[in-house]
Amino acid sequence: MKNHIVGISNSKSIKYLPKIISLLILPIYCLLNLMPRNKRNWIFGSGVGMSFSDNAKYLFLYCSSKKEINSYWITKNKALVESLRNEGLKAYYKYSIMAIWLSISSKVYIYDSRTSCINHWTSGGAFKVSLWHGSPLKNIDRDITVKNNAFYLGNHTFGLKRYFVRMIMPEWFVVADLMIATSEKVKGYFNSAFGCEKIEVTGYPRNDIIISPTLYAKYLVFEQNIIESLTTKKTILYAPTFRDTNRFDRKTPIEWERLNDLLKKNDTTFLIKLHRHDYSMAMKEKCSHIRVLDNESDMYPLFSKVDLLITDYSSIFFDFLLTDKPVLFYPYDIDDYLTKDRSMYDKYDNVTPGHKAYDFNGFYQKLELFFKEPNVLKESVLDYNTIKKMYNKHNDSDASKRTYQFIASNL
């Protein structure tokens, strides 16, 4: 796909019409910097504003029990609003009068992707806290070096291209007042990528559920139902990341029927969880032992049930290391990925502890090995625990507590 900006083609430019219209309210964003805001009101959002997931979800659940503050979830998903309210949580539809009022009067914006999941245009003058959504393996934001990537154009070029990207997607270039990280190493990457000066190593709120699986059980009924439906002897989770250049028609080199036969033989369920920005069809066949989870679903409560994680370049494995379970890496397109999509902070083989496969035959053989001797997949040139500690300073369920204290002490 030529002349693209993070996978955006001319045929899809119509979807940016709302962005162009939103520029008309730019003066409102500027004026809101002068408006007083309530420090007790903290508003939360996640991803693209449709889901209840990731770091924002777990910090919100923690903060909702704090009487010192008022915590509100803002979303474009009306069904989610109803669901959260049924659980006794405060939630509002993004474009409702109440949500707009909260967006312009609340002091604290907490998000794990961009301010737009709440409302970028009402965030002027707010205290912005970015929880982000992963310890990076691939380069992100200011550190992206692929020259046709929107972040590269918006950060490292001049002229019309830079102006266009920053005007159409201003939320991509917001510098948060605070950020959190999982280790000193990750903190350094975030400082470089986002330009945020106040970053605390608190750990990720979403990782609390890895250490304490029953935490917030009252609010995780949907996820618990998925866990209870996994009745096979073993469970494997396949969670690849997205591609900047091929989000819609990427072919995954997996022979699904052959894989399904192996899974059936070993009484194993194979879960597929694509990245929220991945629109490719991972599989088309209907297979008895393979299930595809919704892109926006929260997989962290499932980690307690998962016996093996398979990924390519997703940083999810840094979190999964906290389970002490094996990871299988399947970087089948690594050369193309490094040249066309993203470069990486470290050499891939230097931070990926576990076995690797580069084609389906190798992939199949690694799974056969896993079924015979599961822990063998943890054996590699890299020490599993060394990488685990390098990317996770804390190994407890207090990340939300530390994050809350960090935010409160900086207001």
State what each model feature region is.
Residues 53-67, 193, 199-284, 355-359, ...:
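Conserved catalytic-core segment of nucleotide-activated headgroup transferases in glycan assembly
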Residues 153-154, 274, 288, 315-391:
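Catalytic binding pocket for nucleotide-activated donors in carbohydrate/polymer assembly enzymes
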Residues 109-132, 136-139, 297-341:
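A donor-sugar binding/catalytic signature common to diverse glycosyltransferases
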